[in-house]
């Protein structure tokens, strides 16, 4: 920012995720005009999206309107728009609507997208889960598959088996959590709510080219996670490289695995921020930033969260997780506040690693806090508490906590609604002796 200017500084934040909202919150009392831009009108708690996809939670449980979150931030306005480009020399952000926004400081917190490692054509048949729409579509596909299996029980047993086969690709926390949740949903629903399905008919597979799960965790915890998945009936297939994906199958070498639902959780890449800025990026497309989170040569532009690459302790990159994005947002807000006040800003972001958590299902999780390692119920309790804490508002914490308690007591997943699919995706009704016409 130009320290000679006397007018009110214009701060533009692109992205209302954990990082972007942390910046807005940190600047809520600053003598500046803050503009927060996002393509969606809601802030989404992405770590729990898989629970929407597996009917444990409803979309509104993990999302909140951005305008409601920043309602009390008197210096902040919200724009529902998409960024087209950034003119670094003119200090302008060009929006899809045609609006040009001037800035004195720009914060880019646009997150990450799924990476298919050059096979973007797989995205149609193996969707990842990054948005509410993604989660609803996956949920509906899972539930439709079970309905079809119930309807087709007198037809080809091979086809029926395919309706009850679900494949998750990816060995990180998202893949592990998704596979465990699908297993719990489908097996409990098959046993309780479908007259002609058995839990033993359900097949859930977790496929990954690596030779172990959860690379960020110690090996002993990874093995415990694998054992927990297998206890739920998940087939864990490690060292299996996916060579092709179609609408109803996954190819592993020459082996063809038929499936009704395929979910991608194998990799991410950054948003196009590096292209907007013409900045240096790492292999994942993340903008390489200085220790103070600014872009080299542009002290007025900051990149945070999954969009950035910055060294942490020991020279290792700071992980792309919600706590890191939130801490970076808080740090950048301090830098901007200090600059506005013409004080010396902090020079280096220091990430406080509070550990790694992954849940496998009901009462099953792993937690790595360095010297302290947890698994089983204790890790699951810590995981649940931590995720409730990071939800955006008190209402969401109460709603999610209550739903989890109800599900824990009853095994019931109340959000089993089939929505968002065309009529062509719905099962064809077949009348049988024990299913009378109405």
What function would you assign to each model-found segment?
Residues 19, 111-114, 179, 268-270:
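Short glycine-rich anion-binding loops that position phosphate/pyrophosphate groups of nucleotides
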Residues 8, 333-438:
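C-terminal, flexible cofactor-proximal segment of oxidoreductases
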Residues 1-8, 76-167, 252, 263:
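FAD-binding core/adjacent interface of flavoenzyme oxidoreductases
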Residues 74-85, 183-291, 295-297, 344:
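A Rossmann-like FAD-binding core segment of flavoenzymes
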Residues 2-77, 84, 166, 173-217, ...:
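Beta1-alpha1 glycine-rich phosphate/pyrophosphate-binding loop at the start
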Residues 124-156, 248-251, 256-327, 334:
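FAD-site-proximal beta/loop scaffold in flavoenzymes
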